[in-house]
Amino acid sequence: MKQISATSGPTNIGLLSVGSYRPQRAVTNDELCQNIDSSDEWIYSRTGIKTRRFAARDESTASMATEAGREAIAKAGLEASDIDCVVVATSTHFLQTPACGPAVAAALGATGVPAFDISAGCAGFGYALGVAADMVRGGTAGKVLVLGSEKLSPTVDMTDRSNCFIFADGAAGVVVGETPTQGIGPTVWGSDGTQATAIRQDIDWMDYLDRPTGPRPFLRLEGSAVFRWAAFEMGKVGQQAMDAAGVRPDEIDVFLPHQANSRINEILAKSLELRPDAVIANDIEHTGNTSAASIPLAMAEVLATGAAKAGDLALLIGYGAGLSYAAQVVRLPPG
């Protein structure tokens, strides 16, 4: 019987760089409270958010991803022509087709490469990183640009005092490629569709088209349900990711959880029994919840501020709509 040939790639892979893009407009809690009965103190005490970034009308998921990707490629010392694949994690590309990935690849000058989107909510970056890592290890790509990009501000009901202050806009990403030592551990991922309504679009597009003069769709969040699930289940996922990577909690230098709520992340850090001096990313304070972009944005921030350095061992945990989750242990790239 004729054997089908297969490809294989390097065993040791890692993050070669990280790039980010934050929209210029900073929106304070006080500004949002002009439309809702709340206060800066109330919002900050429950979420850890003081300000967030909103993209301009002419900025899109694709344009923000392009800026972040351009920086990541440059920081890796590469050209766009060196990139073999572009993966964009997003839930806010406002076109049914074509996908965001090909537009980003074309804008960057990564001509002719495979490019596609992954939609896994706030866990999207972890999913995209897992796929990219397997592609490089499998030999189907040498260098993969992995991006998380979201423009959530137009999806939020600014009169909904339960969640209008949570979500924000931005993009960030990494280049994945061969490294001298292992830099990306196995992906631990999964979903629980029985809790799909906890984070959802409240009106589907077919229902909206049936009543185009009715209420428009918005993103809705059942905060208490998500809080309980994330705070008390994601610690187990983080431990599984460390076990899969052969790493102990006291060996983790940096904790990079999804930036959904600072209180959740404090609970997770405690449940994981990380070292007291381990860095816990808190980019949410000035960036808000940027869904699939939040982990790479937080990564860029801890490196840029010097809170962490290249080579540090980091635990990544993404969690959100689906409900979905993904976690990995990685070595941080140069800032």
Swiss-Prot record:
* Compartments where located: Cytoplasm
Q: What class of enzyme is it?
A: transferase
Q: What is its EC number?
A: 2.3.1.301
GO biological process terms held by the UniProt record: fatty acid biosynthetic process
Keyword Lipid biosynthesis applies: yes
- Record's catalysed reaction(s): malonyl-[ACP] + dodecanoyl-CoA + H(+) = 3-oxotetradecanoyl-[ACP] + CO2 + CoA
Q: Does the keyword Cytoplasm apply?
A: yes
Q: Which residues are catalytic?
A: 122, 258, 289
- Keyword annotations from UniProtKB, A to Z: Acyltransferase, Cytoplasm, Fatty acid biosynthesis, Fatty acid metabolism, Lipid biosynthesis, Lipid metabolism, Multifunctional enzyme, Transferase
**What are the boundaries of the region ACP-binding?**
259-263
Q: What is known of its domains?
A: The last Arg residue of the ACP-binding site is essential for the weak association between ACP/AcpP and FabH.
**Cross-referenced HAMAP family:** FabH
The protein in question is named: Mycobacterial beta-ketoacyl-[acyl-carrier-protein] synthase III
